Amino acid sequence: MMAGSLPDQQIDLRGISCPKNFIRCRLALEALDVNQLLQVDLDCGEPEEMVVSGLREAGHRVEIYSKEATWLRLMVTCGGG
């Protein structure tokens, strides 16, 4: 992500279990155009592993923007997948 880039959409999925969090990410990305940014706040652990790998497999670029003790913030660049 370029410094200073603001996300086009933001979703907070902390406390949302798998696979609901992944499905919500996919739905949010479907509403975006290619190269738009989605900010995702997500719990660490299984949600992080499942969502990050699933979105990458679907053709989106996923970067960990910041990480706290129990959650992290992802910046997902829509790949149109």
Predicted regions and their residues:
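C-terminal edge-of-domain segments
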Residues: 61-81
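Amphipathic, hydrophobic secondary-structure cores in small proteins
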Residues: 13-64
